[in-house]
């Protein structure tokens, strides 16, 4: 089934890929992305681990409706999460290149 040293090579490749994935996950956790809403009036910056790092609210919104401001904050956060997930997918593509993964399979992180 496995050629001479085939199983050993397979295990070695799996370990190398696991090491690369762990390193990439650590790098991704340090990256920051900013989501926006209200044409940039609300900005939320999160890191790759989806921890909120900064919230910026244009002063003109402080006089507006509280409900609208809450909606803009939620939309900016959701935009930041979407951007972080896209960035993670791009970064992990280099690690998983050549692997036959089923469609929609999400790598663990």
Curated annotation (Swiss-Prot):
It comes from the Bacteria. The lineage of its organism: Bacteria, Pseudomonadati, Pseudomonadota, Gammaproteobacteria, Pasteurellales. InterPro entries: YbaB-like_sf (IPR036894), YbaB/EbfC (IPR004401). One of its GO terms (molecular function) is DNA binding. Binds to DNA and alters its conformation. May be involved in regulation of gene expression, nucleoid organization and DNA protection. PANTHER family: NUCLEOID-ASSOCIATED PROTEIN YBAB. It comes from Pasteurella multocida (strain Pm70). This is Nucleoid-associated protein PM0205. One of its GO terms (cellular component) is bacterial nucleoid. Keywords: Cytoplasm, DNA-binding. The keyword S-adenosyl-L-methionine does not apply. It is found in: Cytoplasm, Nucleoid. HAMAP family: DNA_YbaB_EbfC (MF_00274). The keyword Translocase does not apply. Gene3D superfamilies: Nucleoid-associated protein YbaB-like domain. Belongs to the YbaB/EbfC family. NCBIfam families: DNA_YbaB_EbfC. Homodimer.
């Amino acid at each position: 089934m496995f050629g001479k040293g085939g199983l050993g090579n397979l295990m070695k490749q799996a370990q190398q890929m696991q090491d690369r994935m762990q390193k990439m996950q650590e790098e991704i956790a340090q990256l920051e992305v900013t989501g926006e809403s209200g044409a940039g009036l609300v900005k939320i910056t999160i890191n790759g681990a989806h921890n909120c790092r900064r919230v910026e609210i244009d002063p003109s919104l402080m006089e507006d409706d509280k409900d609208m401001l809450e909606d803009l904050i939620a939309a900016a956060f959701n935009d930041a999460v979407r951007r972080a997930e896209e960035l993670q997918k791009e970064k992990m593509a280099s690690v998983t290149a050549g692997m036959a993964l089923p469609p929609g399979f999400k790598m663990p992180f």
